[in-house]
C-alpha cells in the first residue's frame, strides 16, 4: 500500500472519529453507551461516556480489588514494591514502577499513608520546571496522572489545581516537540502521557478535552498512517527502539479503550494485528538473565545486557494478546509469553498484575510458523524450530524513515545458543564520533562495501567532526537524522527514502528463501547494483549469493561479516565459536579471495583512523571479516556458506561451486543451489525435488 493510500484511509477514519467523538460529547452526562464501534479483536466494545468516578484509568476500585483477588501472587509482589523497595536503580525499581505500585495499593487497600507518599512523589514533578524538547515530559505527566487518578481522595484541592496547571504548561511548552511520527518519542516521550493526564483530569481540567482531541487527530491523521506504512507486518523501521515505546503507547491505548471505548488498534491493523507475533520473532532463542529474553539488535541499541525494556516488550505482547485473545496466532504468542511469566525487574511486578492474563487459551507454539515477514520495515525473521536451542536468522532490506536506523541494508544476524554474527559497535552516545563513523555505518554490519576514494559523507546526526569513508551506504537526506516527519513528507520525497526492496520471500519448511535489492542504498556514482539472495536450509545452513556491479572496476568490493569472536582456521574456511555456538564460514566465491580479519586494535579502524568506542555497553562482535576479490572487475559474485552448529561439532560438508557464463551452482551435501548471474533467480534441488526459487513475496 502506498503512502498516499494510507493518507486517504486516515482522512476517512478521521471523519468517522470526529463524528463518534461529537456523539460521545453530547451524551457525556448519560449513563447509556453510544453506538458500538467495530473492533478487530473483540466484539461488543462500545463508545461510552467517561466515568466521573476515580479511579477510572485502569478500572474502578471494585474492579481493581477483584483483580487483586484473581491474581494474588502478582498483587503481593506489587504490595512488596509499594512498601519495601526504594525507587532508584532501574534494575530494581524505577520511579514509575514505585509510583504506580504505591498508587495501586492505595486504591485497592485504602492505604492512606502510601497514598500521601505517592502524592508527594508526584508533587516533585509538578513543582519542578517543565521539561521541554527531547525529554520524557510525557512520562512525567503519566506518572502524575496515575497517582492523581488512583489516589484522588488524598489530593488537596490546591494540589489538584497545581497538577492541572503543570499539565497545561507542559503541553503549551512542547507544541513543537517530538512531532516526528516515525520516531519513538511521539508515542513514548509525549502522547501517552498527554492521554493519561487528559483522562485522569477530564472533569476537573477544562482543557483536557481539547488536549486529548488534538492528540487524537494527530494520531488518526499522522501517527496511525505511519504505523501502517513503516510498521506493516508488525516490525518497526526505527528498529530496536520499539522496545522502548510500544509498551507506554499500548498502555495508553488500553486506557482509552477502557475510559471511553476508543479503539486505537483498528486505525492501524497492519501493525497492531502483527506486532505481537513480530515481537516474538524479535527475540533470540533461549531464556537469559532474570528469566528474560534478549531482543535482537536492530539499528541503535543492541540489548546485549538485561535492561527494563525486556519487561516492556513482554508486557506489550501481553496487552495485544489480551485484546486479540480469540486469534490463534495470539494464543501462540501467549504460550510464548508464559515461558517467561514474571517480569525481570522486581519493581515491574505491577506489569504482571495488570497484564498477565492466564485465562487466555494457549496455542501450540511448536507447531507455529518458523518465519515472519514485516514488509513495512523490510525485516525477515526465521528460526529452525521453537526450541530454546534453535538456530536464529534475521535479514534486513528496507526503506528509510527516521533516526536510529542504520546504513545496513543487506545485513543479517545468526544465533545458535549465542550470537554468532551480530551488529558491530557500541551504542552509548547518539551523534558521537564512534556512532557516526562506525556504529551506524555499513562497515559495522554484515553487508557489502564498495570503496570510491572520492566519496564523502556529510551531515550525519549533526556531528561536526570529520566523517570517514567506509565504502558503505550513503546518508543523503534533508534532515541530519535522515528522518521524514510523517507519511506525507515521506511520500513527497519518496525517491530519497525508498532505498531497498525485498524481492522474494518463501518458507517451504525445509528451507527459507529471501532475496533483496539494496542497490539504491548506495551512491549511484559508485554502484550499479547489489542484490543478495539467502537460502536458509534448516536446521543451520545459510547459502548467501551476492551480485555486485560497480561503476568503476577499481572500486574495491568487500563482503563483510561481523563475527562475534575472532575466527580460527584458515581462509577460505573459518570457524567462529561463541560459548556453545559455532559458525563455519566457507568463502566459495570469489576464487582466490583476499580475506582480512580486522580484530583487536584494527576492529574499529579504517582509512588510517580508529573510531573505537569510549564505552562498552555489552558484548559486541570482536572481529570484522572482510572478503574481497584478488583482481579488479566491474562485476563480482560472492558465494558464502555459513553453517551454525553446536560448538562440539568439528566439521561440516564442504561446498563446491561450478561457475558458467550464466549460472553459479553450489553443491552442499545432498542439496544443490543454482543462482542466475544476469538477474535474481535460480533453483534449489533438495530431498530429491527441484524447485525454482521464488520470484515474489509468498506469505503464509
Residue ranges and their predicted role:
Residues 341-582, 589, 602, 632-640, ...:
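Catalytic and substrate-binding regions of extracellular carbohydrate-active enzymes
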Residues 54-58, 67-280, 288:
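Aromatic-lined, polymer-binding surfaces characteristic
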Residues 37-73:
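Extreme N-terminal leader/anchor segments
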Residues 244-421, 619, 628-638, 652-700:
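Carbohydrate-active enzyme catalytic cores, enriched for enzymes
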Residues 10-20:
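Bacterial N-terminal signal peptides
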Residues 2-11:
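Bacterial N-terminal signal peptides that target proteins for export
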Residues 24-41:
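Bacterial Sec-dependent N-terminal signal peptides
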Residues 571-624:
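Trp/Gly-enriched beta-strand surface patches
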Amino acid at each position: 500500500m502506498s503512502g498516499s493510500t494510507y493518507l486517504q484511509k486516515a482522512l476517512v477514519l478521521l471523519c468517522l472519529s470526529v463524528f463518534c467523538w461529537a456523539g460521545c460529547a453530547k451524551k457525556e452526562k448519560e449513563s447509556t453507551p453510544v453506538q458500538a464501534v467495530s473492533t478487530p479483536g473483540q466484539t461488543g466494545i462500545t463508545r461510552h461516556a467517561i466515568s466521573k468516578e476515580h479511579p477510572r484509568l485502569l478500572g474502578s476500585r471494585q474492579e481493581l480489588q477483584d483483580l487483586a483477588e484473581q491474581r494474588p501472587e502478582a498483587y503481593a509482589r506489587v504490595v512488596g514494591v509499594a512498601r519495601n523497595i526504594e525507587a532508584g536503580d532501574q534494575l530494581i525499581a524505577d520511579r514509575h514502577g514505585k509510583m504506580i505500585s504505591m498508587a495501586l495499593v492505595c486504591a485497592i487497600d485504602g492505604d492512606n499513608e502510601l497514598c500521601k507518599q505517592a502524592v508527594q512523589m508526584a508533587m516533585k514533578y509538578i513543582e519542578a520546571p517543565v521539561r521541554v524538547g527531547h525529554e520524557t515530559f510525557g512520562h512525567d505527566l503519566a506518572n502524575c496522572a496515575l497517582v492523581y487518578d488512583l489516589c484522588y481522595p488524598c489530593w488537596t484541592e490546591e494540589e489538584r489545581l497545581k497538577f492541572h496547571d503543570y499539565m497545561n504548561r507542559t503541553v503549551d511548552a512542547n507544541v513543537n516537540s517530538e512531532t516526528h511520527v516515525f520516531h519513538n518519542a511521539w508515542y513514548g516521550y509525549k502522547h501517552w502521557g498527554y492521554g493519561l493526564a487528559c483522562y485522569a483530569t477530564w472533569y476537573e481540567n477544562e482543557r483536557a478535552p481539547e488536549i486529548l482531541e488534538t492528540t487524537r487527530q494527530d494520531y488518526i491523521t499522522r501517527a496511525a498512517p505511519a504505523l501502517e506504512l513503516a510498521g506493516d507486518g508488525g516490525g518497526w523501521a526505527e528498529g530496536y527502539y520499539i522496545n522502548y515505546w510500544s509498551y507506554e503507547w499500548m498502555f495508553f491505548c488500553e486506557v482509552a479503550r477502557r475510559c471511553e471505548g476508543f479503539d486505537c488498534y483498528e486505525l492501524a491493523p497492519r501493525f497492531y494485528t502483527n506486532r505481537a507475533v513480530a515481537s516474538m520473532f524479535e527475540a533470540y532463542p533461549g531464556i537469559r538473565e532474570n528469566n528474560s529474553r534478549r531482543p535482537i539488535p536492530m539499528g541503535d541499541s543492541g540489548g546485549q545486557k538485561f535492561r527494563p525494556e525486556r519487561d516492556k516488550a513482554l508486557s506489550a505482547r501481553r496487552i495485544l494478546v489480551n485484546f486479540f485473545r480469540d486469534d490463534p496466532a495470539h494464543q501462540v504468542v501467549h504460550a510464548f509469553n508464559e515461558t517467561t511469566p514474571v517480569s525481570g525487574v522486581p519493581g515491574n511486578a505491577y506489569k504482571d498484575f495488570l497484564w498477565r492474563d492466564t485465562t487466555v487459551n494457549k496455542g501450540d507454539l511448536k507447531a507455529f510458523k518458523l518465519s515472519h515477514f514485516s514488509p513495512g520495515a523490510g525485516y525477515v525473521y526465521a528460526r529452525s524450530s521453537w526450541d530454546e536451542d534453535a538456530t536464529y536468522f534475521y535479514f534486513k532490506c528496507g526503506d528509510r524513515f527516521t533516526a536510529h536506523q542504520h546504513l545496513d541494508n543487506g545485513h543479517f544476524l545468526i544465533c545458535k545458543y549465542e550470537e554468532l554474527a551480530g551488529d558491530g559497535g557500541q551504542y552509548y552516545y547518539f551523534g558521537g564520533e564512534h556512532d557516526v563513523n562506525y556504529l551506524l555505518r555499513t562497515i559495522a554490519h554484515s553487508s557489502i562495501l564498495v570503496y570510491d576514494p572520492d566519496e564523502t559523507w556529510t551531515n550525519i546526526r549533526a556531528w561536526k567532526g570529520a566523517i570517514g569513508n567506509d565504502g558503505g551506504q550513503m546518508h543523503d537526506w534533508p534532515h541530519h537524522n535522515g528522518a521524514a516527519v510523517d507519511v506525507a513528507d515521506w511520500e513527497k520525497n519518496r525517491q530519497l527514502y525508498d532505498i531497498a526492496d525485498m524481492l522474494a520471500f518463501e518458507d517451504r519448511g525445509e528451507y527459507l528463501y529471501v532475496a533483496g535489492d539494496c542497490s539504491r542504498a548506495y551512491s549511484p556514482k559508485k554502484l550499479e547494483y547489489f542484490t543478495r539472495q539467502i537460502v536458509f536450509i534448516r536446521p543451520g545452513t545459510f547459502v548467501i549469493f551476492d551480485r555486485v556491479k560497480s561503476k568503476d572496476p577499481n572500486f574495491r568490493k568487500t563482503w563483510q561479516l561481523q563475527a562475534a569472536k575472532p575466527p580460527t582456521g584458515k581462509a577460505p574456511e573459518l570457524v567462529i565459536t561463541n560459548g556453545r555456538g559455532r559458525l563455519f564460514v566457507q568463502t566459495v566465491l570469489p576464487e582466490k579471495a583476499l580475506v582480512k580479519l580486522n580484530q583487536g586494535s584494527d576492529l574499529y579502524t579504517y582509512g588510517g583512523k580508529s573510531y573505537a568506542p569510549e564505552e562498552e555497553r555489552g558484548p559486541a562482535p570482536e572481529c570484522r571479516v572482510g572478503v574481497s576479490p584478488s583482481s579488479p572487475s566491474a562485476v563480482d559474485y560472492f558465494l558464502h556458506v555459513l553453517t551454525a552448529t553446536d560448538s562440539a561439532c568439528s566439521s561440516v560438508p564442504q561446498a563446491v561451486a561450478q561457475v558458467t557464463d550464466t549460472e553459479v551452482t553450489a553443491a552442499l551435501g545432498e542439496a544443490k543451489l543454482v543462482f542466475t548471474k544476469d538477474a535474481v533467480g535460480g533453483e534449489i534441488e533438495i530431498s530429491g525435488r527441484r524447485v525454482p526459487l521464488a520470484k515474489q513475496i509468498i506469505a503464509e
